[in-house]
Design a protein with these regions (language model features):
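Cytosolic, long alpha-helical scaffolding segments
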Residues: 1-212
Length: 212
């Protein structure tokens, strides 16, 4: 019985890795849509659907583990954490769709002034990758490392926000463009928040304590 349970847990880990890779890919596409002005909405929609399908598949695996097996406390933490993590990964996909909607109508020549948004995207990708690896490897230090990127993302957002406020004061006609860029930065910040949530659920799965 335990061997079967461990096999299902291994499958759960594999599915989480795949879903995490989808999130990394879709965040990369969001950044490209901002900087290159080329938005492949079909590809992004397809990945978004794959993320949704992965969420349902992982939910099903978790429910079977809970109902058909007899998980001990640490197993329950791992399963419940996985359920929380996939919710945040799905929301990352939703934030990307918001970014792409704004980037579609944005002149990409202005994007060169906001390379910090690219750094925000890179940081969120790193957070997701580290968090999923930490979950699979039960590596508490790796989960803590992932959380460190949240402050970096917040700092970049503050820099961008202050810069845009200054631009609006100097040139009120640029207000609409500035607001779109600010919202894109805000969506990346929210992706960072979801990635932080993932790391915190990894910590919970290992220690039984959340949000420390």
């Amino acid at each position: 019985m335990r061997n079967r349970f461990d096999t299902q847990l291994e499958l759960l880990n594999k599915k989480l890795v795949i879903m995490g890779e989808m999130c990394e890919k879709i965040i990369t596409l969001a950044a490209e849509s901002f900087f290159q002005g080329k938005v492949d909405k079909n590809t992004i929609s397809e990945i978004g659907k794959e993320i949704d399908d992965s969420e349902k598949e992982i939910e099903s695996i978790c429910m079977k583990l809970l109902l058909q097996q007899q998980p001990v406390a640490k197993d329950l933490r791992q399963i419940s954490s996985a359920l929380k993590m996939i919710t945040d990964m799905k929301r990352i996909g939703n934030q990307v769709e918001n970014i792409v909607d704004l980037a579609t109508n944005l002149d990409s020549t202005y994007a060169e002034n906001y390379l910090s948004i690219g750094r925000m995207a890179e940081s969120t990708i790193r957070m997701v990758k580290l968090s999923i690896q930490a979950f699979v490897n039960k590596d508490l230090e790796m989960a803590k490392e992932a959380k460190l990127y949240d402050d970096i993302i917040d700092d970049f957002f503050c820099l961008i926000k202050n810069d845009l406020i200054s631009i609006i004061h100097q040139n009120p006609d640029s207000g609409e463009y500035a607001i779109d860029v600010l919202m894109i930065a805000k969506y990346f910040e929210r992706i960072g928040d979801h990635a932080t949530n993932i790391a915190e659920w990894v910590e919970f799965s290992i220690t039984g304590m959340h949000g420390e």
